[in-house]
Amino acid sequence: MIISLRVANDNTSKEFIKETITKYHSYVPSTSSVGRRIDWVVFNDDVPVGMIGIGSSVYPPPKDILTHTKLSMKEYKDNFNSFASNWRFCMREKIKNAGTQILKELRRQAPLYWKQKYNDNLNYLITFVAGGNNGAVYKADNWSQIGETAGLPKHKSVSMKWDSKESLKEKYVKTTGEDKKVILCKKIEHNQNTSTSKSK
């Protein structure tokens, strides 16, 4: 088994990713996202078997992110582009021990392509895990579980990242715990290999 990640730069890989999410993601079969985005196709011995992607972080952030990173809201906002959210991780088949290999390679490639595409240093990866999952694959890669979201009714679980303070007040929805997510975070170590040559 040789696991590799290749950035989705062509229509074929993008269609593969769209189909993978739509057909195989267990609880959020949506391919839409807001803001920045870089996706990879996951290969096992040169056979495409899944996808993983990162995108813009969340705003406003859950307080657990601020507590873990020791940042104020203003500092987080000023450093917003140094955070990325692992917005999807979806496999078409179960492959033993593949998860940690994929996440390790993501940590190697993500800061390189983030810098290349957006000219920002990537310092933190975060992810939100729901659907009854506890984030075991992330924990096996030494991500820290830093908290949980309060949970919104599923029909109200939408991004309000770009709303003003006034519109946020209008859209306020009482938390219910219905769609609670586990929050995990991984600090990027910038002394990792700085070459993208391993990606094909």
For every predicted segment, state its role.
Residues 1-35, 41, 47:
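Short amphipathic alpha-helix that is part of the acyltransferase structural core
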Residues 7, 36, 44-47, 54-180:
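Acyl-donor binding region in acyl/amide transferases
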Residues 42-45, 186-188:
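Active-site beta-strand termini and strand-to-loop segments that position acidic
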